[in-house]
Each structure stands twice: as C-alpha cells, then as structure tokens.
C-alpha cells in the first residue's frame, strides 16, 4: 500500500551500505581532522588572505623557466600514454586540460563515459612535472588536487585505479578509521598526495577546511564532479554543493574544473557564475549518438507493457538494462521475466553489498544478460556492449533519461533505447514531487523551533546544535527539503553557518585491556572517561559534551581517546545520533513578524521547487509525445543541435513513423466525497490541509508514518484524482486560505 520509505532509489549515495549518520556526516568522527599540533604554513605566507596569483594566459612564467602551451600539452600527452595507456585525447579533453594547466577555470560537459575524470587526473599528475621544468617549486611542494563527488563508490573505484598505476591518491569517506584519517592528514602536510577525494558534506567540517592551509604546496586544483548539483535549476540539486564554491574561495584554490554529463543552458550559467568560469572555459560534447535508436511506445494500461517487452527482448538480443522506479518493481519484473523464459536479475540500493557486487560482476562478464534495476545501477558501469536500455516507466527528468541511455552502445555498434509510456505510472513521479513541499504551518513551526529563545540570545560566533532527524519527524518535513531550508538560512539569508557535526550518542563494550590501558595512559581525559562512563549491562555510555564542560576538557580530545581505545582493541565503540551544529552569523529573527516574513520567503522558494519538479515530468512526456525527432529534441534540451543542423536523426520512433507517439487521453474524475470523509474519519487533524491531501493521494511523510496512517484504507484512496483538487477540498475543511 503506497510507496515504502526505502523503495525509491534517489541515486545520490546509494553505492555503499552506510547508515544515515555516515551519510550526513561523511566521516568517522567530527574531530578526525582537527589537528592537535598544526604545522607551519607550507606556502610561507604569514597573511592567509593574500590571494594566489593566477598564471597569465598562454604561458606559466617564473624567473627560473618558462612553460609554453606546447610543452604543457606534451607533458599531458606523455601522462595520457604512460599512465593511462591511451594514444590520444578524445573530443574536448585536450582543450579542457590545456586550460587547467594554464591556470584557468573550466567547465566540462561530456556525456556519460566520455572521459571526464581524465580532465582533472592528468593535471594533478602534471603539476609536479611542470614544476620540475619551471623550478618554481620543490619536488614535494607541488600541492594537491581535491575532487569533490557525492558518489562514494565511484570515488573508491577511481582511487583504487590510480593507486594501481602508482599515483598517490586517497579518499576521505565514512569507511575510514580514525588512524587512516590521521595518516591522510600527515601525507597532506608532507606533500605526499597528488589527489584527495571527498564528499561535499566534508566541507562542513571545520577541521578539514582549516587543514587546507597546512597542505604542502597548497591546493592546485579542485575538481567538482556532478557539478549540476549546484544549480537550483538542475535535476538533482544538492544544497551542500552551494558550499563548494565558497570553499574554493576560502582556501584560495588556484583553479577549479567542474564536470557534469547533463547540463542545460540555465544550469551551465549557474555553474559558471558560482565558480567564475568565462564562456571560453566551457567545453561541451554533443549528447547525440548516431548509433542509438531512441524509441517509445505509449499504452493505455500498465499490464499492456508486458507483451511489448517480451516481443522487444525476443527481437533485440544482447546485454540489457531495464530501469524501474521502485525497488519492489525491479524485483517483481525480474522474477516475471525469468518465469517467461528471459533470465533476469534485479538490482537496487536495498540489497546487501555482496549481492550487488555479484550481480554487477556477472553483468559485466555477460554471465547475466538482463538486469532490472533502479537508478542505483549504472553509475561507473563502463560496459561497452550494452545493446538495450529499457525504461519500464517514465524517468523523472530528461537529464536522467539522457544519462541512462548513454550507457548503451559505447562500442559504437547499433543499440536500442525503448521507453514505455503509461499515464498510470505518472502517479509515482508526482508522488515524489509533491512529497517535498511541507505545509506553511509546518515550516513556520520549524523556524520557531530553530530560533527559540536560547538560540536568538546567542552572540555572534556562538554555536547551537539541532537534530535534523528529530525536526523532520516533529514538523513533518522530509530530510531533503529540510536540508534546502537550512542551506537557505546559511547561504541566502546569511543567518547561520554549518560547522562540524557531532555524534550525540557514545556507547562502548569494554574488553579485558580497557581498565589497564586507561590507567597506563593516566591523563585527565582517561580519568574523566573512567569516572563518567556509566555501565548498563554490557555497554558503557558517556555524554562527552557534559563531561567536557564539567571537567574543563576539550570534547575533541575525549573523542580522540575513545577512537584510540577502539583502534587498539580496548573497547568496541558504537556512535550514533548525529547532531548538526551551526554558528550564529548575524542577528536572528526574534519576533512573530520576523518569523512570518522568513516563512513567506522560504515557502515561496519551496513551492517553486515543487513546480519545477512537476514541470520536469511534463518535459519528459513532451519529449516523447511532441511532433519532433527524438534526437533533435534531446539535443535542443541541452542547447545543442543535430550534426549539420539537421531536423531529423532518421532513426528514432518519430522519424520511423512520421508521426508523434500518441498518449491515450486521461479520464477526467470528479473529487470523491466519500473518500474525503474516509480520510477525515482516519485522523482528527483539522489544521493541516496538505497533510490530509497527502494521506488521500498516498504520499508518505514523517508524520504519516508516525501515526501509521499509511496502514489505513484512507491512505491512497484518492491516488487516481487530481492532487490540487484534493488539496482545495481539504483547505475548505481546515478553513485555510490558498497558498
């Protein structure tokens, strides 16, 4: 009944089975990067605010030597051949790399599989080679390239591949132990690393940001992967990406390269504005692939798709990826196909790591021909001979569609991309789009909770802590829009700033060496842990904030000691309950009037986001059903044209048939009064029309789940009706005005 909370794969952080705390914090501990004894500033500048001088266009000059464009490209080409075993650059790779080596910023918009990563990996390796020629820096003073990416598995894969090539690279992620993090810190200070990968959430860590001024040689380059996430016009906006641009400026990075596979003209404008990239620094490769046959069929009912799918698979052999929206869909369709004589496996984020790896390996080696998957499958998959990409239901955006069909036919051979269109599937997508907009009352109550009496009386620079999870449940606001709200308070209104998060819960199981170890250490911290760690059954628990305040100790020192004890086997440590921490930047809203004004501004922004999400779904439907060549529509969506400005690709459904794909008309339905009454009978809530409409339409929310209303017959009782009409009826019941 309805969509389970965990049945939809967003695709953002679905590649490692880490818990929510790890995803939010992206680190072993909040103090893992706070240095006890900072080293000397490696660049020798006593004033950290002195800007880094950019190289002039055309050459990098020093008193010891000069490096022209030809020499720089020779170095890059040698690295391409020696380290990566490629004979030549493809498309715009050479131009983008040349610009970076020249000291300028760049944006790379290449399709999936077109080699974006080389555009920062080669410069990272080239910097020491260039320094040898110019003699501007010592061998161990060539600095670091930092790569920011939300995709943990991809970061790990790239680091492993670089290490196999003998290139010094590391990844700071949630799987690292405290000791491993400290080793990375040491290597950074000593100039031993060429590349460091991290998630955007890492940039909230004050210790990490502070560490940058002690990096030997400084930050030569920052690579921003999935850069479209910075744009509010983009299809997968992530608030933490807005902080990447701020990070680049604050640490005085010499240059930046942004990379994405899918960027429309408005998204490109946003990226260029945020990272100071001029028009001549944008490098694009066409999304048009002449070997891909873009096809679509529209059906009246979902069950009509099965026969079409069987026929397609019979006539189109080879490796096949079928994309479904829900985890349950993927499982059921794979089982259905297997029963019908088309052996298939399913893949989604809810599976165990070993299960996912086995299926991925079998698909890569063609032991499995067909995989039915959610969006969680495909990132980083570089299988050249995928013959078919099938969309079992409508993708969420044109960008998502483009990215997924781009996984077919990378060997240049003819491949097929089929999309099945059915109105019954639209409900799922609308459900996701509608679910992120809270009620205005919920937003106002949240702001009053954030800016309570204790917080508004804090002085500038003082900090406060909140639990996003707790606020999400209490105010019926999903984590995603909650993150957007906090990002706006930080970056748009400049009221607060996120700092290093903290774990609220510390528990450990003591081993036989626990007491002897603490007695040998014999420090104020060890004595405090011995005194204040309370044992209940087999676990000890301790409130580090309370202990630090009571004993006059640094919380980070207590954390470090617990990590040491854990790494040395004296305890088995369990941490949890992430609390976000914010610093006050300006005068905070105290009065009801001030809160109301802030509520109005934020709510308008959230409403705009909902509208954009719904419009993206409409764009996908229009892409398929408009009287235009699919290839041309796709190219124009990204601000491009077909080769030779052609109006037809000649090999899509529209070009074959000479007419548009006709979607059967929707059957108009009046609001069901009995269903309205059914919802009102299921709950006594009468002050939140949007909450009641969510129940009727079948939209899960924290409050719906907490009250177990998704288990009642009222949930989804109006899923086949117009949401706006439903909302209007419940506003009458709650006597609310229109938003």
Describe the residue ranges of each PLM region:
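Accessory DNA-binding and partner-docking regions appended to nucleic-acid-acting proteins
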Residues: 1-76, 99, 446-449, 453-739
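Intrinsically disordered, low-complexity domain-flanking/linker segments in eukaryotic proteins
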Residues: 130-141
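K/E-rich alpha-helical interaction surfaces of small helical-bundle regulatory domains
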Residues: 87-88
